[in-house]
Amino acid sequence: MAGRKLALKTIDWVSFVEVMPQNQKAIGNALKSWNETFHARLASLSEKPPAIDWAYYRANVAKPGLVDDFEKKYNALKIPVPEDKYTALVDQEEKEDVKSCAEFVSGSQLRIQEYEKQLEKMRNIIPFDQMTIDDLNEIFPETKLDKKKYPYWPHQPIENL
């Protein structure tokens, strides 16, 4: 059990050190050595504790019934393993993040296509020194003045000036 749990929770120390500030490298090295020591001690433990030889204790303990009482209490002792209520939440958030990332990527692909069309349009326009005002208004419609809606000069709303 210790070995299996140990394999699940590993730290990528190379990337950890890359993001660590220079003045905290000593603290990071101490953390890494402590972590390696802890993992080595954890890996040396067996999955189940060794069996207790109750007959040996019955033979060597002077007070009768004491070992039997300890054995009953030891066998009745059940240490609960804390329930893992956060892994499901993290998995759900991961699925939502994957979904939102996929939406963002698809939206980005659409924006890229639109920008590539605009870029191609910009590459194919007439040079500005050869362009007439009609060509400019055709290529960039936002520059066209609306003389019907705004009959007086500057032919656009005052807010846009």
From Swiss-Prot:
Q: Which GO terms describe its biological process?
A: proton motive force-driven mitochondrial ATP synthesis
Q: Which GO terms describe its cellular component?
A: mitochondrial inner membrane; mitochondrion; myelin sheath; proton-transporting ATP synthase complex
The primary gene name is: Atp5pd
Functional summary from the UniProt entry: Subunit d, of the mitochondrial membrane ATP synthase complex (F(1)F(0) ATP synthase or Complex V) that produces ATP from ADP in the presence of a proton gradient across the membrane which is generated by electron transport complexes of the respiratory chain. ATP synthase complex consist of a soluble F(1) head domain - the catalytic core - and a membrane F(1) domain - the membrane proton channel. These two domains are linked by a central stalk rotating inside the F(1) region and a stationary peripheral stalk.
- Species per Swiss-Prot/TrEMBL record: Mus musculus
N6-succinyllysine modification sites are 78, 85, 95, 144, 149
Q: One MF term from GO for this chain?
A: proton-transporting ATP synthase activity, rotational mechanism
Asked if the record carries the keyword Cytoplasm, the reply is: no
The answer to keyword RNA-binding applying to this record is no
Protein name according to UniProt: ATP synthase peripheral stalk subunit d, mitochondrial
